[in-house]
């Protein structure tokens, strides 16, 4: 099985993206502050150009941290919304394989992380 993360975007297209496992310490963009994350693997999802705030600077997302309690996905944290770049890092119990999908109507980007 898979644990699924879905990012939804305004507009007709998913922005450019890059997905990879990264080493600790996980750092916030801009400040460089260390971001504590649970898990034995950290899958970074970066979108560019993108933003997660309005023109007035208000966040467009409900939460910057989620703890979904899924078999492998332990936590999902926003680590960047700065200068046209948005990043999220998933803390996983085991850094297993993953796949990505782009979906339409509405525009969505999906990351499926294998359980084993």
How would you label these PLM feature ranges?
Residues 1-116:
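Short linear recognition/processing motifs and adjacent strand/loop elements at protein termini
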């Amino acid at each position: 099985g898979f644990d699924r993360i879905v990012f939804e975007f305004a507009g007709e297209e998913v922005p450019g993206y890059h997905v990879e496992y990264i080493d600790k310490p996980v750092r916030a963009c801009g400040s460089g502050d260390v971001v504590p994350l649970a898990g034995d693997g950290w899958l970074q999802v970066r979108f560019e150009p993108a933003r997660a705030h309005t023109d007035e600077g208000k966040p467009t997302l409900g939460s910057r941290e989620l703890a979904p309690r899924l078999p492998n996905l332990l936590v999902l944290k926003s680590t960047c919304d700065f200068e046209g770049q948005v990043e999220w890092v998933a803390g996983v119990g085991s850094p297993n394989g993953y796949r990505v999908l782009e979906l339409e109507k509405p525009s969505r980007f999906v990351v499926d992380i294998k359980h084993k």
